[in-house]
């Protein structure tokens, strides 16, 4: 049966995902940045309360995946922390200036991760040559690759995802970016074994007082009175679709 991973940005969202049938959680911070490393406090609280597998993302900033020496040192430290806290896996990825996997740095990450399952995130979608990259990731011992098939969403990239799945000795290919209940059947019919979804929506802040003349963001148009939350009903709907597909 296909595995359902839900992207979560808080301990509460991880619990919602678990209660509604998620098989695994990718734990992140900063949804508007596409997911950054969660704080130590969030990591500890999730580790204590969530019982399904949780894989934290290790990404020190938004933007590209070519990191300075200082940023890479922080990545290694965060990998060690996640391992010490007892998480079963993590999500990360590093590219070089030419859009190839930075093999030297990824080897250091794999050594620091030890027995943890490592997912190479959507840095894969920014690489120059996906098939060569897939071979490199297999050589590194990467467990799975999260990809939209190098398109803006996974449905558009489904043909490339199918090509990657068919590639010999490839890691597990997990489809992600825009995967929802309404299009999930396309991925299941294509034989995708793992899907990744945010399964959520922006929720208004409970704050009644709002200082509309001041923003804490450099983006003047940012809505600072909303937060992204997992929709339990959406998770349950996706899980039900997967179970019904398996029963056919």
Swiss-Prot record:
GO terms for molecular function: copper ion binding. It is found in: Cytoplasm. Coiled coil: none annotated. GO terms for cellular component: cytoplasm. Keywords: Cytoplasm. InterPro entries: CutC-like, CutC-like_dom_sf. The keyword Transferase does not apply. Belongs to the CutC family. Homodimer. This is PF03932 family protein CutC. It comes from Shigella dysenteriae serotype 1 (strain Sd197). The lineage of its organism: Bacteria, Pseudomonadati, Pseudomonadota, Gammaproteobacteria, Enterobacterales.
